[in-house]
């Protein structure tokens, strides 16, 4: 007994925190022979694996002879009167022990079976081997340990029910079983290094990986499906960009806008007539899309749309825009803040092209979006990137940045200086050499420069992309860069002009719906 216990401790210590490779070829494949299994075993050992899982007594015997790694042995059978396949008979246990398996795996699920799992575990122990129980539930793990199993494997999770096999491994089962105190091996659908690492972090002592290493038929299929799916033209996305004055509807595929329509944004935001008017813009496109997406000004938190600045657009409180538009369109609808959507568009197809970035749109107001590590950062409250809402010191106290540096802010400062008109007229006056106009624009650029320097310090993106009617107006980026000259070099961001223009939001929101949220 002491000798057996010592062997158990020695082997589990060799496996703790290590990779076990399952060398089980696809049945009747070109690799379904003893020589291939031995080659797999040798390659696994040479590459740093610490254990092998092998099916069939002949394969176990050959691998145990060719490798110094401990072998988990099993025999698979297809029975007419039982769904249990892994080592269902006592004679299977005997054959595996005689073949040299250090560990014998048995199906320990709670299903109809020819021999109780407890008897199989007892026979493994009687023969001086380590008993591994392949289970699918926490209750089965507890029963197997009560029967004397030395190792629990999550092998059967997802393979005992009536429904389709899950795509991902059962990390929840790993976490629950890790609290039982026995040696735990995570197994089943670990098809990436990331998933294997997650299993260890979830509490597994070791991880078995099979198909992703030793089944080229499966690996080829994964890559084939990914390539063919990417090459296949996707269905267009129905996308809307709803602004305070106009609404754009378009069918979008990738960065290509296939068709577009524009209308004046209806009054009575959120009313049934408002929903109906916007939905009617795309009525004859029914059947050409499967998903829809909406870019809107304001705050989007989950499915709830609300105002960040009611002066820009008055939105009914806690308005479920996605649900209302989804019902009208008969399709699932994603709703994204328009500046965040534009940030994604510029990241995917525009000025940033895959770089960590912040996008700022400077027009009637100031909005923004952040993309880091390939992810759109929406934030806990849906307001990430909303630089225009940051409070800054104004002439008479703290005000929103967009009050001073947006199109509305520029027009207001011009009016206070005795010059009525909009931001466009201020730019025209500055271009004509009017000193008052240039001072207003330089002041706006200075306020914005201080804010983006702070943004660089907080987010530290590779670039800050500037768009919007004010941001792209002649000379404004030069003024912004000039104002940034008063800040230290490390705080001066790489300022680049947006490339997608007014289409950034609708392209971005469509791509998010097609790829990011699908």
From Swiss-Prot:
GO (cellular component) term, any one: cytosol
Coiled-coil parts of chain: none
Associated pathway: Amino-sugar metabolism; N-acetylneuraminate degradation; D-fructose 6-phosphate from N-acetylneuraminate: step 2/5; Amino-sugar metabolism; N-acetylneuraminate degradation; D-fructose 6-phosphate from N-acetylneuraminate: step 3/5
Protein residues bound to ATP: 239-246, 365-372
Pfam family, one: ROK
Record-level Gene Ontology MF annotations: ATP binding; N-acylglucosamine-6-phosphate 2-epimerase activity; N-acylmannosamine kinase activity
Protein name from the UniProt record: Bifunctional enzyme NanE/NanK
Keyword Transmembrane helix set for record: no
GO biological process annotation, one example: N-acetylmannosamine catabolic process
Protein family: In the N-terminal section; belongs to the NanE family.
Region (ManNAc-6-P epimerase): 1-234
InterPro entries per UniProt: Aldolase_TIM (IPR013785), ATPase_NBD (IPR043129), NanE (IPR007260), RibuloseP-bd_barrel (IPR011060), ROK (IPR000600)
Substrates-to-products reaction catalysed: an N-acyl-D-glucosamine 6-phosphate = an N-acyl-D-mannosamine 6-phosphate; an N-acyl-D-mannosamine + ATP = an N-acyl-D-mannosamine 6-phosphate + ADP + H(+)
Region (ManNAc kinase): 235-518
Keywords, in A-Z order: ATP-binding, Carbohydrate metabolism, Isomerase, Kinase, Multifunctional enzyme, Nucleotide-binding, Transferase
EC id: 5.1.3.9, 2.7.1.60
Function as written in the Swiss-Prot or TrEMBL entry: Converts N-acetylmannosamine-6-phosphate (ManNAc-6-P) to N-acetylglucosamine-6-phosphate (GlcNAc-6-P). Catalyzes the phosphorylation of N-acetylmannosamine (ManNAc) to ManNAc-6-P.
Protein's UniProt keywords contain Transferase: yes
Domain of life: Bacteria
């Amino acid at each position: 007994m002491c000798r057996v216990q010592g062997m158990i401790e020695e082997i589990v210590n060799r496996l703790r925190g290590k990779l076990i490779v399952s060398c089980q070829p696809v049945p009747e494949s070109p690799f379904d022979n003893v020589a291939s299994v031995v080659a797999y075993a040798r390659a696994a050992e040479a590459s740093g694996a610490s254990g092998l899982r092998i099916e069939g007594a002949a394969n176990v015997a050959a691998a145990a002879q060719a490798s110094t790694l401990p072998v988990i042995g099993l025999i698979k059978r297809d029975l007419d009167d039982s769904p249990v396949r892994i080592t269902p008979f006592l004679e299977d246990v005997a054959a595996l022990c005689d073949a040299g398996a250090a560990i014998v795996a048995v199906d320990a699920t709670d299903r109809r079976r020819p021999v109780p799992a407890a008897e199989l575990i007892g026979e493994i122990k009687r023969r001086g081997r380590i008993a591994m129980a392949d289970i699918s539930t926490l209750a089965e793990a507890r029963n197997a340990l009560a029967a004397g199993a030395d190792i629990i494997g999550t092998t059967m999770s997802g393979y005992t029910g009536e429904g389709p096999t899950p795509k991902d491994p059962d990390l929840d089962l790993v976490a629950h079983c890790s609290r039982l105190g026995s040696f735990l091996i995570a197994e089943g659908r670990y098809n990436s290094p990331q998933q294997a690492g997650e299993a260890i972090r979830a509490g597994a002592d070791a991880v078995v990986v099979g198909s992703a290493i030793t089944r080229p038929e499966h690996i080829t299929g994964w890559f084939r499906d990914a390539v063919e799916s990417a090459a296949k033209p996707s269905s267009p996305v129905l996308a809307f960009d709803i602004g305070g004055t106009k609404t754009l509807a378009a069918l979008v595929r990738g960065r290509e806008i296939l068709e577009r329509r524009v209308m004046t944004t209806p009054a009575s935001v959120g009313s049934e007539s408002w929903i109906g008017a916007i939905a009617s813009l795309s009525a004859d496109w029914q059947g050409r899309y499967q998903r829809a997406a909406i870019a809107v000004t304001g705050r989007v938190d989950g499915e709830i749309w609300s105002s960040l600045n009611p002066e820009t657009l008055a939105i009914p409180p806690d308005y479920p825009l996605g649900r209302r538009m989804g019902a009208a369109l008969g399709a699932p609808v994603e709703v994204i803040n328009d500046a965040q959507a534009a940030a994604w568009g510029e990241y995917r197809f525009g000025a940033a092209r895959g770089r960590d970035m912040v996008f700022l749109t400077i027009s009637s107001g100031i909005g923004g979006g952040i993309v880091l590590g390939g992810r759109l950062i929406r934030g806990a409250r849906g307001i990430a990137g909303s630089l225009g809402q940051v409070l800054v010191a104004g002439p008479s106290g703290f005000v929103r940045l967009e009050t001073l540096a947006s199109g509305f802010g520029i027009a207001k400062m011009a009016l206070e200086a005795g010059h009525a008109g909009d931001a466009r007229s201020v730019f025209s006056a500055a271009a004509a050499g009017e000193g008052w106009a240039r001072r207003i624009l330089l002041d706006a650029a200075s306020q914005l420069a201080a804010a983006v320097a702070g943004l660089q310090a907080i987010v530290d993106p590779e670039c800050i992309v500037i768009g919007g009617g004010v941001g792209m107006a002649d000379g404004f980026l030069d003024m912004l860069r000039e104002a940034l000259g008063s800040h230290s070099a490390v705080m001066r961001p790489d300022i680049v002009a947006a490339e997608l223009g007014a289409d950034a939001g609708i392209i971005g929101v469509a791509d998010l719906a097609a790829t990011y949220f699908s």
